[in-house]
């Protein structure tokens, strides 16, 4: 697991936040719950909606994150909005034809009581990350992890996938 604070510039963060706000009013969203395996969604009520980032934002993210992300020939970038009760139980990403996943947090302020914690397990035990603006988490497709259900607000991220 790789954890990076302030992974992008404030300017790029503002551009991402602006584009996300604009996309909220477009008919471009789909439910990611359709893609999750039933055992992964077990016990989770809410859903998460997704839409691709624009080519412009994708290019800017690739440039700013190129030294942080694993080298990969094809990257996919999507906005995710985790709604009330949305979360995902313990899983890894092996079944999804991905080499790695990365989560870039877009919430400006997030209270611990809002839920949406990213939890992972390794040889040293369990670890948690609260959503924090510009924080980047990178994990390989074998990393066991989950996201606790969102209690309040909307958990906004850019999910980055290194595709196989």
PLM regions: where:
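Non-heme Fe(II)/2-oxoglutarate
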Residues: 1-70
């Amino acid at each position: 697991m790789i954890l990076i604070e302030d992974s992008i510039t404030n300017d790029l963060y503002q551009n991402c936040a602006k584009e996300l706000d604009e996309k909220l009013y477009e008919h471009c969203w789909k439910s990611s719950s359709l893609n999750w395996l039933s055992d992964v969604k077990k016990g989770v009520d809410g859903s998460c909606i997704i839409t691709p980032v624009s080519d412009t934002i994708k290019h800017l993210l690739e440039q700013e994150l190129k030294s942080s992300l694993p080298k990969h020939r094809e990257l996919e970038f999507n906005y995710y909005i985790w709604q009330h009760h949305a979360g995902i139980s313990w899983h890894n990403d092996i079944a999804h034809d991905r080499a790695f996943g990365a989560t870039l947090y877009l919430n400006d302020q997030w209270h611990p009581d809002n839920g949406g914690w990213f939890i992972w397990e390794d040889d040293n035990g369990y670890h948690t990350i609260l959503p924090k603006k510009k924080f980047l988490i990178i994990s390989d497709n074998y990393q066991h992890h989950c996201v606790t259900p969102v209690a309040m607000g909307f958990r906004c991220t850019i999910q980055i996938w290194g595709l196989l």
